[in-house]
């Protein structure tokens, strides 16, 4: 790992054992990107990679006879109005109305380690030898403003992180209309764009499209979250790249609010990728001495396919984004009462469910919505964070201790960012909701968005919920958020500051998370947003697991968890066994398949075990024991491999292999049964070719070498006409090395 500056050629080379990133200072003192990809040898002069020729209609930005044009240059941070007619990464409006800027090289610093960008979450280092950072300071003399571009390269990961910061020193105010976190350019357009798209109950479906000239993008304008529609991630892969071979570049934004990921192909087949805060309804005024910091983009390069890209994201996000008590721990097996009771419960019913959970070996009981205020339905009570003593006469403090006396840990659901109008909080502070003057106040789920851009609102909510936690014995918090923002306007905020509201809202969320996780470091936080609408890297910084989707149907979860695995580690995926018929789809799937899918996540239950048969209870007990035996491998110690995609056929398969390749667990899932089906073999991945393994599944056992299991494969059982399996059949394989 090194960051080298070659003074004569004015080139920067950032590299480790797997990746190189090269930029140079051009003759106009702006930055040009020369190369990003597989690691290449360092040399004194990389300027041979600069491409330049005279073209018709080009606007030249250097004195004659120079022919440098920004329109045909791969720029490091492109700006508006000086001959580049593609989308800029930065737009600044000055007091005279001009948007023309000229940020030129002023200085740079190379140092070991990595700085925080608080209050924004970001990846980190635990010692300075893990990474090196380059900070390049560019200066606009007319505005007297600095633009600082930061690059960090890690020793152990093919990862480059980037962010940008504006520091305004001039006497006249300026307004940021757009500032991306990173911009990267490629020589050609021979790529496919991979994105994770969807909606409620079908989050993060894998979508591919071939790049075309013009702009293709993903974005969120939801205000409160990164959204279920478009995850803040995209990748560019070569057309023939697969899970296991070929080039792919991943871009992941560590941010939970409005985002934009854009790929633009020029008429000369150059490809520009930009990612950052969505500029729509964003406007940030800076006066003298003020600054603005962008979120971080985590860029991953792989020349070994999509699965290597994913494993890199899994490792760095688990080890250098998540932090705190739970970073390196396997998760407790929980039971959540939501689908068992919804709002209809009392203390006796809750304790009966908890007792049965304890008998089955569950470790954590979670009380969901309905425990506070006058909360008996969606219409009222939200925002009143004090216990409903009619339902729970012992209070949360008493109930939590009764649950602990059963031998279980106790967890609690909250939705801190929202309010019902039928609540004491709203009646006391009607001006605390986000809404525009003299406009209809749109509602969703009968609730409204609290204005977290205001410190006094965050302060109030913090004190309310912290009081409940302090007085109780709580080991887990599920932090939900169930609606998007509408009519974005902050009452009492100056008109010139309204463009800051949505970003400041997200900063308010981060502030509350920081306060709670600081005061209660032992609590396991799980984020949630109508299921998986805020499954983004920034949330993992505060809450090391996220509710993956409200859709708990096993067959649907195959797609959701498969897509989620493109970026997010298995240990971050909230995954539960729920009742049948499923509450979202009314589909019935086998209890074994529901568990076989949920194992590849945090694992838990979302049902009333009292309603199961004695046979089913015994099956649940066996599932719990299996997960306890294998969760360190699945959640902490293993690498995840995708084998068969549910987006490409009727079958899904994946597996987790320990780093020493001594253990593995694999899941195979057949969606619909096939009559008189053809044979197929399941080929495992990630094993030691020369190691002898014992493979167990159902009542069968096989000893075979790793190369047999990976290349020849193992036949998937086919009974004649498949009469015995039925739809939604699954098989779980355990693989152990033989001495």
Question: Model-flagged regions — what are they?
Answer:
Residues 71-72, 76-117, 245-258, 300-325, ...:
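Glycine-rich, aromatic-flanked loop segments that form ligand/cofactor-binding clefts
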Residues 420-459, 503-610:
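Glycan-recognition surfaces
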Residues 5, 9-13, 17, 31-264, ...:
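Polysaccharide-binding surfaces and accessory modules of carbohydrate-active proteins
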């Amino acid at each position: 790992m090194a960051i080298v500056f070659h003074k004569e050629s004015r080139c920067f080379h950032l590299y480790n054992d797997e990746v190189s990133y090269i930029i140079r200072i051009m003759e106009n003192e702006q930055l040009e990107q020369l190369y990003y990809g597989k690691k290449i040898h360092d040399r004194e002069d990389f300027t041979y990679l600069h491409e330049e020729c005279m073209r018709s209609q080009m606007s030249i930005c250097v004195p004659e006879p120079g022919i440098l044009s920004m329109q045909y240059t791969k720029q490091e941070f492109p700006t508006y109005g000086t001959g580049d007619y593609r989308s800029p990464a930065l737009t600044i409006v000055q007091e005279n109305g001009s948007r023309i800027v000229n940020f030129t090289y002023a200085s740079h610093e190379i140092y070991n380690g990595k700085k925080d960008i608080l209050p924004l979450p970001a990846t980190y280092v635990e010692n300075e030898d893990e990474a090196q950072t380059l900070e390049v300071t560019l200066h606009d003399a007319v505005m007297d403003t600095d633009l600082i571009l930061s690059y960090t390269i890690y020793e152990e990961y093919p990862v480059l992180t980037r962010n940008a910061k504006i520091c305004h020193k001039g006497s006249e105010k300026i307004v940021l209309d757009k500032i991306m976190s990173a911009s990267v350019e490629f020589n050609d357009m021979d790529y496919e764009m991979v994105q994770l798209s969807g909606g409620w109950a079908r989050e993060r479906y894998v979508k591919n499209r071939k790049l075309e000239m013009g702009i293709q993008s993903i974005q969120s304008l939801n205000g409160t979250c990164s959204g279920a529609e478009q995850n803040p991630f995209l990748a560019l892969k070569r057309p023939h790249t697969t899970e296991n071979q070929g080039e792919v570049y991943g871009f992941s934004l560590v941010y939970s609010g409005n985002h934009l990921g854009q790929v633009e192909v020029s008429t000369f087949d150059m490809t520009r990728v930009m990612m950052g805060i969505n500029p729509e309804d964003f406007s940030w005024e800076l006066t003298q001495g003020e600054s603005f910091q962008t979120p971080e983009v985590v860029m991953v390069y792989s020349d070994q396919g999509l699965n290597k890209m994913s494993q890199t994201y899994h490792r760095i996000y688990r080890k250098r984004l998540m932090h705190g008590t739970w970073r390196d721990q396997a998760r407790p097996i929980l039971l959540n009462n939501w689908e068992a009771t919804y709002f209809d419960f009392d203390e006796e019913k809750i304790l009966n469910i908890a007792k049965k959970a304890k008998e089955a070996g569950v470790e954590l009981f979670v009380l969901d919505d309905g425990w506070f205020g006058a909360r008996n339905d969606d219409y009222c009570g939200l925002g009143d964070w004090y216990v409903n003593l009619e339902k729970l006469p012992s209070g949360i403090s008493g109930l939590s201790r009764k649950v602990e006396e059963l031998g279980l840990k106790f967890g609690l659901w909250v939705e801190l960012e929202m309010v019902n109008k039928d609540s004491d909080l709203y009646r006391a502070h009607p001006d605390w909701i986000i809404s525009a003057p003299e406009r209809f106040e749109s509602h969703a789920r009968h609730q409204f968005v609290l204005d977290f851009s205001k410190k006094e609102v965050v302060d109030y909510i913090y004190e309310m919920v912290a009081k409940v936690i302090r007085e109780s014995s709580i080991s887990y918090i599920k932090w939900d958020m169930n609606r998007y923002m509408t009519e974005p306007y902050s009452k009492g905020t100056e008109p010139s500051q309204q463009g800051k509201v949505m970003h400041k809202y997200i900063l308010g969320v981060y502030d509350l998370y920081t306060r709670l996780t600081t005061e209660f470091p032992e609590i396991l936080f799980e984020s949630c947003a109508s299921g998986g609408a805020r499954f983004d890297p920034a949330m993992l910084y505060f809450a090391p697991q996220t509710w993956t989707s409200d859709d708990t149907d096993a067959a649907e979860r195959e797609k959701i968890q498969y897509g989620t695995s493109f970026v997010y580690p298995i240990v971050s995926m909230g995954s539960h066994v729920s009742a049948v018929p499923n509450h979202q789809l009314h589909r019935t799937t086998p209890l074994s398949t529901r568990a076989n899918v949920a194992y590849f996540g945090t694992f838990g239950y979302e049902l009333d075990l009292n309603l199961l048969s004695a046979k089913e209870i015994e099956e649940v007990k066996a599932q719990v024991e299996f997960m306890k035996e294998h969760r360190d491998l699945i959640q902490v110690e293993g690498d995840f491999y995708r084998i068969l995609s549910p987006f490409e056929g009727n079958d899904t398969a994946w597996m987790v292999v320990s780093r020493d390749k001594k253990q593995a667990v694999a899941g195979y899932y057949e969606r619909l049964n096939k009559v008189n089906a053809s044979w197929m073999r399941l080929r495992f991945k990630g094993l030691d070719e020369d190691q002898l393994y014992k493979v167990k599944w159902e009542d069968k056992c096989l000893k075979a070498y790793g190369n047999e299991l990976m290349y020849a494969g193992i036949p998937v059982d086919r009974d004649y006409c498949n009469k015995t399996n039925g739809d939604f059949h699954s098989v779980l394989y355990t693989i152990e090395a033989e001495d």
